[in-house]
């Protein structure tokens, strides 16, 4: 079937391309991050086939969700953009790529916390919501992805409400703050946050809420200042770190790149208690810092222990969470199919009604005026009876997910809007009521 004759159903036109900690490792995820989301949106939206886009970036993933008229070309273009950001070729097996219903399922799983490094962690739900809100504010999201992300957030909330998957769960950055709270208490303490990326922001925000005096240290001073302003803290370049270490009570290091930002020599002059927590991957703190008796060093494993408290209980909830997701996925896809059916029927009825009115006008010019009401009722009744089986077949096809039948109906009746318009009207309650009124069904 020619591309122009296709009846688009937005789920079919959805792709997701990305990298995450499972397939690529956190170091590659860090490299692939887009420091300027607006520049990323601009680049992705220039891909000719892309109609809508949402960029979901967290500490553990960079994922691009797009509605497109050419899935293959769009996937290849997004892969190229991610490779350009990473500064290196990315092997095929390190990409995560989903199409259509599988892409929706993946997003629902992400929002529910099933794909998180810490099972059920709560931060991801907020991040999914904020990603869609940012795309909407900047004009890159349309009706399809708006509906998809709204449902993902709703499903994520339902999973957390109806299961214990997220009970007691926190992400790694939040867990590092909890660990410090348990070790030294954060109220009034001077905390250095090394790194102003996603993880650093979570640490800084949570620590500030607990009363810590937050100092952001980053290679790029402008980014440090931006985050410091958000949390009411101070900002310094990385070169100031050795001096700051002597004054701090605690440090959380959340950087990428693989180099050591805190070495044994860097803490040689520390002469009061200092807790250093490294949540970088790969590690960015030399374990030898613990040779200084004043330094308490905690690595990712120590933080993971805090994050994974109650993990076995949460694991037992995975099946229930997955059942909820599959049920919601079926409802979501069927909803989209029903919307398409309503769109076809509305366009069909409008077209047939216009033909009826035109032909009725011609007939009325040749018969006495007193027959007008009779002819109007007769032709209206005739149209309803002729189209009744078509309407039932369209409804039945939508219920079965039979897009072939829906396409055939749209082609036979030359329904141009249904054939060529990529967007679908999602709020169809008014359409349904109008159809019921017209057809008396």
Curated annotation (Swiss-Prot):
The keyword Oxidoreductase applies. Substrate binds at residues 58-61, 116, 121-123, 127. CDD domains: NAD_bind_Glutamyl_tRNA_reduct. Disulfide bonds: none annotated. It holds the Pfam family GlutR_dimer. Pathway: Porphyrin-containing compound metabolism; protoporphyrin-IX biosynthesis; 5-aminolevulinate from L-glutamyl-tRNA(Glu): step 1/2. This is Glutamyl-tRNA reductase. It comes from Ignicoccus hospitalis (strain KIN4/I / DSM 18386 / JCM 14125). The keyword Manganese does not apply. Possesses an unusual extended V-shaped dimeric structure with each monomer consisting of three distinct domains arranged along a curved 'spinal' alpha-helix. The N-terminal catalytic domain specifically recognizes the glutamate moiety of the substrate. The second domain is the NADPH-binding domain, and the third C-terminal domain is responsible for dimerization. It comes from the Archaea. The gene is hemA. Its EC number is 1.2.1.70. During catalysis, the active site Cys acts as a nucleophile attacking the alpha-carbonyl group of tRNA-bound glutamate with the formation of a thioester intermediate between enzyme and glutamate, and the concomitant release of tRNA(Glu). The thioester intermediate is finally reduced by direct hydride transfer from NADPH, to form the product GSA.
